[in-house]
Regions:
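Conserved beta-strand hairpin/beta-sheet module of binuclear metal-dependent hydrolase folds
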Residues: 1-45, 124-134
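Hydrophobic residues at beta-strand termini and immediately following loops
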Residues: 6, 97, 184
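Active-site HxH/HxHxD metal-binding segment of metal-dependent hydrolases
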Residues: 12, 23-26, 33-111, 189-192, ...
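Core dinuclear metal-dependent hydrolase active-site scaffold
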Residues: 17, 101-126
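Metallo-beta-lactamase
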Residues: 114, 119-208
Length: 209
């Protein structure tokens, strides 16, 4: 497995390429803002784009999706159904990103973890020792809960679930706010929100509201 992290757009977003090195079959995660930059990375590495994985449906994470659907007609697009209302248009080949489902491309097995909170349909994607957390968990931060479909209570439960991943699991967040990557173990030591979620629901809810 290999990963390319691409910083895109004016909001310090990350889009990702995730691929199986044996077959070069790849997924693009949260394609946004700079479609040509992402396409160049795909071409330079000789990758075969097989799917798009969306952590959630806010525009700053999906606004380059149509470009890749046009380039690859019939491209499977994975999104949790609870976030469909956020999309301006429905993908042509929409697949449900269901909690616990395993998505495969080449030899890659990518597990879907439903992590509502920032949006009702937010998910994280776990591949080997990497977890793509979208706007659920950042380095030193967590997602906002003051937007349509968001819930502080749901985010509390989602962060508690992520904290159960092995400490060596590498976090690949949806934005570069305090750093590009970290691990679950480091964040349990230094991320106030992850700490509060592990200790005090009332304290967590007070901190995020």
């Amino acid at each position: 497995m290999d990963i390319e992290q691409l910083k895109v757009g004016p909001m310090d977003n990350f889009s990702y390429l995730l691929w199986d090195e044996a077959s070069n079959e790849a997924a693009v995660i949260d394609p946004a803002w700079e479609s040509e930059k992402i396409e160049t990375a795909i071409s330079e590495k000789g990758l075969k784009l097989k799917m798009a994985l969306l952590t959630h449906a806010h525009p700053d994470h999906v606004n380059a999706l149509q470009y890749f659907e046009t380039k690859s007609p019939g491209l499977p697009v994975y999104l949790h159904e609870a976030d469909l209302f956020l999309l301006e248009r429905k993908p042509e080949n929409l697949k449900k990103a269901q909690d616990g489902a395993v998505i495969e491309t080449g030899h890659l097995k990518i597990k879907t973890i439903h992590t509502p909170g920032h949006t009702s349909g937010s998910v994280c994607y776990l591949a080997e020792t990497a977890v793509f957390t979208g706007d659920t968990l950042f380095v030193g931060e967590c997602g906002r809960v003051d937007l349509p479909g968001s819930s502080a209570e749901a985010l509390y439960e989602s962060l508690r679930a992520l904290a159960e991943l092995p400490p060596e699991t590498v976090i690949y967040p949806g934005h570069s706010y305090n750093g590009n990557t970290s691990t679950i173990g480091v964040q349990k030591d230094y991320n106030l929100y992850l700490q509060l979620a592990s200790k005090s629901k009332a304290g967590f809810l007070k901190a995020v509201r």
